[in-house]
A protein has these predicted regions:
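Short, conserved catalytic-motif segment at the N-terminal edge
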Residues: 6-62, 163-171
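Extracytoplasmic/secreted proteins, especially bacterial periplasmic and envelope-associated proteins
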Residues: 8, 12, 16, 69, ...
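Short active-site loop at a secondary-structure junction
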Residues: 24-30, 50-112, 170-185, 272-275, ...
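A short acidic/small-residue loop/turn micro-motif
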Residues: 46-49, 295, 378-380
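Short, surface-exposed loop or secondary-structure junction motifs
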Residues: 101-345
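Short, gly/Ser/Thr-rich active-site loops of penicillin-recognizing serine hydrolases
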Residues: 293, 305-316, 336, 379-407
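Low-complexity, glycine/alanine/valine/leucine- and proline-rich hydrophobic stretches
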Residues: 346-364
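Short, well-ordered beta-strand elements
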Residues: 358-364, 368-381
Length: 407
């Protein structure tokens, strides 16, 4: 029987990983891999500075990997014929979403899932997110704004009609073909999920996905089990680790009391569907191993893993240092050599970056392999919007070229 906790890596691999985490000045983190031999895991440092160690019971807000769960729930609803990927998204909304530069091209759910909607993350979205996501801890006396208020002047959320490329060429920003990675896409998806299911988003994800494979965690902190430890996301300022999110010193229920009165469709930013899933690294690995093996999810996997956008010189914003060459639905696809990814294509997954935390999860459906990396706080800060972090590259080199090469 395959261990659910995971075996330790061989001493040489553990030593290499320890050296990498130490070299990059990591506060706490983990590496978990899945393959034909089951799970292997590595844990490093602290969940809280000089206090509680980072272990298999440490839960972390995993940033944008969360989008895969939001996308999976929507695709389940597509399979159930509750929704149509290629229908004008306004069919499902209580506000109007039209690109003013291309009013005759309807924005669809498929475009939201593969980031070709031509939406962008505007300042007004960030302002509403802060008022909503951290309402209890930062703005306890403020009411949650209605999500539709964001779209009173909806045109501000779209990219301009044309953009100049890195080589000076003018590129048309056409819905359905131009890729621009945008958090707002998945907030709108989650809003639609709530409107159709008439349940809070966190409940939908729990019932449809996490409970299916008995994975603890969720999109609200109350869903973390009593034996789990929620690690805040940390940034180093000076020589002090500063918690940027999920830093709670009192029981969760005494902070998040208003969640009980939440009305589905009010403002799904409450659950941060683009970034707010809290789960352990082993839990995340277990989820995707179960997902790969689940024959009843075959239609979902087919829809997700099928290529729906490929990069050209003029059809994307070249974000994250040109990391994204291909996209499925709610997932990044790597189908050719890139860093340590050199075989077992395609690799399906996502990166996450938020408040000092760096996460990634990639899996090879054909080889039944996968890798999960959690980095929470590091002394060597990157500048700009880069692709894979140097520490992620170092870790992947050890796993792909030493650990898996021995199989």
């Amino acid at each position: 029987m395959i261990s659910q906790k995971g075996e330790s890596y061989p001493a040489s691999i553990t030593s290499s990983l320890n050296n990498i985490f130490a070299h990059h000045g990591v506060l706490g983190g983990s590496v978990v891999t899945i393959d034909k031999n089951g799970y292997h895991s590595f844990y490093y440092g602290d969940a809280f500075p000089d206090s509680i160690p980072f272990t298999d019971s440490t839960f972390l807000r995993i940033a944008s990997i969360s989008k895969m769960f939001t996308g999976m729930a929507l695709l389940q609803m597509v399979e159930e014929a509750k929704i149509d990927l290629d229908q004008d998204v306004n069919t499902y909304l209580n506000f109007t979403l039209v690109n003013p530069s291309y009013p005759n091209i309807p924005i669809t759910l498929r475009m939201l899932l593969n980031h070709t909607s031509t939406l962008q993350d505007s300042r007004s979205i960030l302002t509403m997110a802060k008022r909503t996501i951290f309402r209890d801890s930062l703005n306890p006396n403020h009411s949650i704004p209605d999500f539709s208020e964001l779209f009173i002047n909806g045109n501000s959320h779209f990219l301009p009609r044309t953009i100049k490329t890195e080589k000076g060429k003018i590129s048309k920003v056409i819905p359905g073909s131009y890729f621009h990675y945008t958090n707002l896409n998945f907030v709108i998806i989650a809003h639609i999920i709530e409107r159709i299911e008439q349940q809070p988003f966190h409940v939908v994800i729990k019932k449809r996905l996490l409970d299916r494979y008995a994975i603890p965690g969720g999109f609200i902190v109350q869903e973390i089990p009593e034996q789990g430890t929620l690690s805040p996301q940390y940034l180093l300022k000076g020589n002090t680790w500063i918690p940027e999110a999920d830093a709670y010193t009192v029981p969760y229920d005494s902070i998040f009391t208003s969640i009980k009165d939440y009305v589905p469709g009010r403002n799904v930013l409450r659950f941060s569907p683009q970034a707010g899933l809290r789960v352990s690294s082993m839990g995340l690995a277990r989820f995707f191993r179960s997902f790969l093996s689940d024959s009843k999810m075959s239609t979902i996997k087919t829809m997700m893993f099928k290529s729906s956008w490929k990069a050209k010189s003029d059809n994307n914003s070249h974000q994250f240092d040109n990391l994204f060459k291909e996209w499925g639905l709610a997932c990044h696809i790597i189908s050719e050599k890139q860093e340590s990814f050199a075989e077992d294509f395609p690799w399906i997954g996502h990166i996450g970056r938020a408040n000092g935390a760096f996460t990634m999860m990639y899996m090879s459906p054909s080889a039944r392999k996968g890798i999960v990396i959690f980095i929470n706080g590091k002394r060597k800060q990157s500048k700009g919007s880069i692709g894979f972090e140097s520490i992620e590259k170092d870790i992947m080199n050890v796993i792909f070229n030493k650990h898996w090469r021995k199989e």
